[in-house]
């Protein structure tokens, strides 16, 4: 069998991996084998953390809504129950922004649930 020279194909593949790992520390951005391993690991972390980011933001929003609700003498769960009972369908992201930046509107929403 004749020898196959795949010079530019291999170089292109290695170059692509090394470009993806630019900015990594030490050999992780210089040596192909370690760079390839770190690239695989980085992609795994990225996919895991996309789901984790959604979780973290939801926790942050709930904490902010709870702080706003406590100022009104309610717990988070009581407030959300009142919203559902009154048919107020505002998502947690917007409620958290209202509780943090526009407390007057947030307080009016809470007052509306008392009626």
Swiss-Prot record:
Keywords: Chloroplast, Plastid, Ribonucleoprotein, Ribosomal protein, RNA-binding, rRNA-binding. It is found in: Plastid, Chloroplast. GO terms for biological process: ribosomal large subunit assembly; translation. GO terms for molecular function: rRNA binding; structural constituent of ribosome. One of its GO terms (cellular component) is chloroplast. Binds directly to 23S ribosomal RNA and is necessary for the in vitro assembly process of the 50S ribosomal subunit. It is not involved in the protein synthesizing functions of that subunit. HAMAP family: Ribosomal_bL20. Belongs to the bacterial ribosomal protein bL20 family. This is Large ribosomal subunit protein bL20c.
